[in-house]
Amino acid sequence: MKRRYSAALLAVILCVLIAAYNIIYHPVQSGVPVTSFPKVTHRILLVPLDSRPPCRTFVIDAARIAGCEIVTPPTEILDYYSQPGETEALQKWTMENIAGCDAAILSIDQLLHGGLLASREAKKTSEDADRLIAFLNSLHTAYPDIPLYAFNILPRILPPDSIDGRDEKKYLMEYSRLADRIDIATAPSEDELGELEWLRSVIPPESLTRYDLLFSENARLNKRLIELAAGGTLNRLVIGQDDGERYGIPNREKRELIRHIKTLKLDDENVFLTFGADEIALSLLAYIEAQRDGFSPGISIKYNSEATPWRIMPYMAATMETTAL
């Protein structure tokens, strides 16, 4: 019994000594309360590409680090996966909530189609596009001191999901690749021209028309947006290329837009063509914040091998070097 008592007493004494040692030699430092994020100093209105986290939540969180509050439309009027956003309500909300903001980042796909997925079906008419252009002009007229940063996405090479049939989609993809190769060829071969005609004959006419119309209507809209940038309605326009390949009709549209940009004598500060879609709003946020702070970051690229710059990665329409630069 005495041994148990002695052992317990010894354990208590050791605990007291250890506690005293820590208190004397390792005192707890008094903490200084800090805020989690900087104080909000400015606000940016955002109409996101769609409601997924990379397009909306990531932008909101990144902006808070810079002391910026992002104002976004209510989720009730935004897209929800395959359900398009309410475009008229979104335009109305934008007009009513832009006052007091220092800038606006606007997804054309959301304002016109109701999101990225809806834009791939392109159910909107030329008249709908005309009304959107009129809305952007009205927005700039009403708030001329608030810079508008808009972005639009080229249709991807993949046919819309509403076009059924594995063979039909396969032929459309082959048609798209071949049409682009012929467009850039100095002298296309008779075999290539013959194959293109054969593909046109085996693809159902309504599907071929819908596929071609995706790009022609998008090119028409992008040209008008480029002209808004030239005229000062848009402070900057970014055109992104989503899910591309080395050859495809999206590349042909891009070359057409580049010619239009050169005709208007615009530079990258007016209209910027890039690769990707989801990250464009974040990139525009970084651009706005860098401009605001007078910061110009320097970037150095180091490749893991000599062949890497010339590789074309899946879903990309250009080499790694072109994409990185």
What are these model-derived regions, one by one?
Residues 1-5:
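Positively charged n-region of N-terminal signal peptides that target proteins for export
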Residues 8-22:
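Hydrophobic membrane-insertion alpha-helices, especially the h-region
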Residues 22-325:
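An N-terminal assembly and electron-transfer interface module characteristic of large anaerobic redox
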